């Protein structure tokens, strides 16, 4: 994270080491699990014994290596938006905890945890043969365990989580907005997200900018990019305002929003002025094009709907409202989730 603090956000290491003997299997897996969060992710080497360090050399752990790399690709919309933020503000992508939590003296000497962008705390396993990992959660907000149904912890404490070789300890920050590809991307250059899954954790009022362009040319300098501002506010009634601008037409056909709320269940969900259908059966929800479902296990609302900004004649106009609600080069729509108290028996 030191390079990011020094104004070079696109940092990264040669995964597995560039020279010298190949690392043992466990070390290589853990190295990849860390590397997938580095803006510059590269597995290559020139070993002194005329070998190379590549994933296919570790056949017993190939699935774990593949899983970590696929996670990186699913998080591509989040990473690309962080790259855009870095280009505009200089903000690091891999962030030392002290960058975000300067009022917590406990993070001043923390060297092995970091934030991936603003919202994801990563605590890679760094001890061989480890079965647990102690994680310090910075004070000032709540944290939600990515790997354990968003189990919630107060900040300002050290917790201990169980780990196996496949585990990458990750925690979402209260107020998080994390976009991911619904479809599995296999290439940053050739593949595009045809669906977006956005995980949100209401708490503090929050604004996030989701950025996209063609990823290849400099046409973004001519305005061929799309910036979608996502504004989340409210507690009993959470409103998420989407407002997009730009000339670039993305590929997103389907939207999915996952909203975590541990202390209350949802009452109703609306997209614009339309109240969405509530599905009690997960399979029926999965088969539907639009609606919402509540996971008792995660304590999270899952909302899905076709991207309302899709224009059949012009590809996809971005996350937005139906065509009559277009503004110049952009669209707006509001997703509302009610966590208000409700009376089932009319008393």
Write out the residue ranges for each language-model feature.
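Catalytic-domain carbohydrate-binding cleft regions of carbohydrate-active enzymes
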Residues: 1-167, 172-173
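Surface-exposed beta-strand edges and their flanking turn/coil or helix-capping segments
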Residues: 23-26, 46, 55-56, 108-111, ...
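Residues in intrinsically disordered, low-complexity segments of regulatory proteins
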Residues: 30, 55, 142-145, 210, ...
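N-terminal start-of-chain detector that recognizes signal peptides
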Residues: 69, 92-97, 106-108, 200-204, ...
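Solvent-exposed beta-strand/loop surfaces of large extracellular or lumenal domains
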Residues: 146-165, 268-302
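Accessory, solvent-exposed terminal regions and/or long lumenal/extracellular loops of proteins
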Residues: 172-274, 283, 295-299, 304-311, ...
